[in-house]
Amino acid sequence: MSKRHYIVSIKTIDDKLLFPTDFNGEAFLFGVTAKASAKTGVIFKGYSSFPTGLELVLYCKSGQEARMFADEIANSIYIKTNSIGHIIHSFGIHIGELTNDERTLEAVMMDMMTRSMAARGLDMESIPTLSFDADGKLLN
């Protein structure tokens, strides 16, 4: 059976913030996605976080595998946010299958990044392009 791409969307139902404003959500999300990937063997190709949730692109054998990954992420979010005194009462998980067309995957990743930046009030055009020399030293 060939592996397929899935997009997993986890979002608070009541549109409340997923994390408190003084909490480093980016580091937390990287931690829980890496942990879920290690526990389930599912490869995640990228994620985008929003004030009210997150979306991930996964590389799975089946929808069941994608669901296991999503459940692991959801459990980690609930346990961690509960421990810092910010309980998420309800959030929904949606799993959708992508095609194997890499352009589709790239388009989805770009869309996720754009929406994530927009949620933070950033403009795609305002992000500077970084240039590096042959030794990896930052030029600008």
What is each stretch, according to the model?
Residues 76-84, 119:
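Short catalytic/binding micro-motifs of nucleotide second-messenger systems
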Residues 3-15:
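Active-site-flanking beta-strand signature of metal-NTP-handling nucleotidyl enzymes
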Residues 22-41, 76-78:
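Active-site-proximal alpha-helical element of nucleotidyl cyclase-like catalytic domains
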Residues 41-47:
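A short linear hydrophobic-aromatic micro-motif
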Residues 47-55, 84-107:
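A short glycine-enriched loop-to-beta-strand structural element that forms part of the catalytic core
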Residues 111-132:
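Catalytic/regulatory signature loops of cyclic-dinucleotide turnover enzymes
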Residues 69-75:
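Short amphipathic alpha-helices in soluble, non-transmembrane regions
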Residues 61-66:
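Helix N-cap motif at beta-to-alpha junctions
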